[in-house]
């Protein structure tokens, strides 16, 4: 039975963007299968006492920008600290990823997730806009308009709710969040620890 890592994703998270490619590379290296779970982090914050960015204290908002600058420079990754279309709801993108996963598999959804996050944090695109999402999906080789339409179907909405409920039950409170062997790891800055857990399973 393949080793699995559950990946709770908020597509609008800059830290998910910074960690996404490294997560996929580590999973490939260690033969770990990623279970992608795009979720409603508004509901998760409500359940866990978290605050959306706009409601956080100014000190926390300022330090967040400093940390993002440090990490983007350290990793050598382009990142616009204050993109034009942020804050933005990640729900439309999350549901598109679920629709992609159902239609084309997890690898396709993971690849599209990377494209969506880069679109927000590097390319100044509005990932809350259906036409933008359709164009990104089409650029990835899919029928973007059909996937956006599918993202509002009952099956996708049901999965979105299920993933969110699972996250709350698993004590998730931030994104990105990774789970392996029932143990949670919050944030891309925990990827070293996560990779150690991957290696222990070999």
Where on the chain are the PLM-derived regions?
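C-terminal cap of thioredoxin/glutaredoxin-like
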Residues: 4-6, 12-32, 111, 115-202
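Structural alpha/beta surface segment adjacent to cysteine/selenocysteine redox centers
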Residues: 11, 17-120
